[in-house]
């Protein structure tokens, strides 16, 4: 809205406001605004969560050192969502449809996380939503994102072609071109592979961030790095000069998502101030699912979802550790690969301090993200 006011309306009278035309300037302001919102509202949110006795439940089958965290205010993801969305609305172009797709995804997955946290914390059911109910809700939210993008594809704002890392020319299309355009209702079936793909990507990212959120500041620190990488990727994908030079799919309207990514970085930095070890607040599922939905949606829109294993490398490793642990336990008569899963608990059991695990995983996340950016030229 500030973009509309300062540039669209007041620029003819105050030429200085011309700077708000530039995406980099608005991204910087959005990031700073998001960080300040999180920093200044954080203490109030923590106080209110304590007043309502919304505290973390710690299972006794996890690391025993975590039992002291019982009662720490949780559901702090509400603060993250507010700190992301307000600056996005303030500093982005409200006529850009991709902004609203990202906002919808963040809110939808955040709502699923909120319901899960509410059941766990308020209703005192330790496991929250059942796995089936959670996956169903995630599928519905993912379908909503996919349908919105299909509509935008019809207006030629979006492409269903994938960008494949390391390959310049091969861009497989996630549409089935089996039906003639003269049969519009039948032709809609062409988008089934794309819709299924979007649902799977969003389920993967949301649950991966959720699994990583097990140590103070771990998930939010990795999110800062992943969102920073997405900020760069979004900007170059929307800039005709950079996209042409790097031979990326150029979609001019996706550039506005740089503001959204900047807000995500700023909000995450502000939240980390209170979530750093020893944490004063936890994000809960409302935060992890909202962030996972935001990361996955941005990657899908800029057609870089195949880079997600590198952009969010730690998220992927954490998820793989759980899959391997469960698979090994079921298929090898109770034998485990790791001392405990997810992966960060394995290193705790090896004797690493919580702070050491967190910082080393952040370093790993940074290395993965930097490699993701180098793939733009390694093709």
Located regions from the model:
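Alpha-helical transmembrane segments
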Residues: 2-45, 80-111, 147-170, 190-379
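Membrane-interface helix-loop junction between the first two transmembrane segments
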Residues: 43-61
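Juxtamembrane helix-capping/reentrant segments at transmembrane boundaries
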Residues: 58-72, 126-137, 344, 349
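Select subsegments of transmembrane alpha-helices in polytopic membrane proteins
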Residues: 69-81, 133-139, 354-364
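Membrane-interfacial loop-to-helix junctions in multi-pass inner-membrane proteins
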Residues: 95-103, 122-137
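Membrane interface segments of multi-pass transport proteins and intramembrane proteases
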Residues: 120-129, 165-172
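Hydrophobic cores of alpha-helical transmembrane segments in multi-pass inner/ER membrane proteins
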Residues: 139-148
């Amino acid at each position: 809205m500030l973009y509309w006011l300062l540039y669209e309306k007041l620029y003819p009278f105050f030429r200085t406001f011309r700077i708000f035309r530039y995406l980099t300037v608005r991204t910087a302001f959005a990031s700073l605004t998001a960080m300040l919102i999180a920093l200044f509202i954080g203490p109030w949110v923590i106080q209110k969560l304590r007043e309502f006795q919304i505290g973390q439940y710690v299972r006794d089958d996890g690391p025993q050192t975590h039992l002291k965290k019982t009662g720490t205010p949780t559901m702090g993801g509400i603060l993250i969502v507010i700190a992301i969305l307000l600056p996005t609305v303030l500093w982005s172009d409200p006529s850009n449809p991709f902004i609203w797709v990202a906002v919808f995804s963040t809110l939808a997955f955040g709502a699923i996380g909120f319901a899960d946290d509410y059941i766990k914390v308020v209703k005192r059911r330790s496991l929250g939503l059942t796995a089936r109910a959670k996956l169903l809700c995630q599928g519905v939210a993912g379908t909503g994102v996919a349908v919105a993008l299909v509509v935008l594809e019809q207006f030629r704002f979006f492409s269903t072609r994938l960008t494949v890392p390391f390959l310049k020319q091969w861009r497989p299309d996630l549409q089935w071109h089996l039906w003639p355009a003269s049969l519009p209702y039948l032709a809609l079936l062409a988008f089934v592979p794309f819709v299924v793909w979007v649902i799977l990507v969003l389920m993967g990212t949301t649950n991966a961030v959720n699994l990583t959120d097990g140590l103070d500041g771990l998930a939010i620190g990795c999110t800062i790095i992943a969102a920073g990488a997405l900020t760069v990727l979004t900007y170059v994908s929307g800039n005709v000069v950079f996209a042409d030079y790097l031979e990326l799919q150029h979609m001019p309207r996706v550039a506005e998502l740089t503001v959204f990514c900047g807000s995500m970085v700023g909000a995450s930095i502000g939240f980390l101030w209170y979530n750093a070890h020893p944490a004063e607040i936890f994000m809960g599922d409302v935060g992890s699912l909202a962030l996972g939905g935001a990361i996955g949606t941005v990657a899908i829109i800029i057609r870089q979802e195949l880079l997600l294993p590198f952009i969010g490398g730690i998220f992927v490793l954490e998820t793989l550790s759980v899959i391997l642990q469960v698979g090994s336990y079921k298929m090898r008569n109770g034998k485990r690969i790791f001392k405990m899963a997810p992966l960060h608990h394995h290193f705790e059991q090896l004797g690493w301090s919580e702070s050491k695990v967190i910082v080393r995983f952040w370093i790993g996340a940074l290395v993965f993200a930097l490699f993701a950016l180098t793939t733009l030229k390694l093709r």
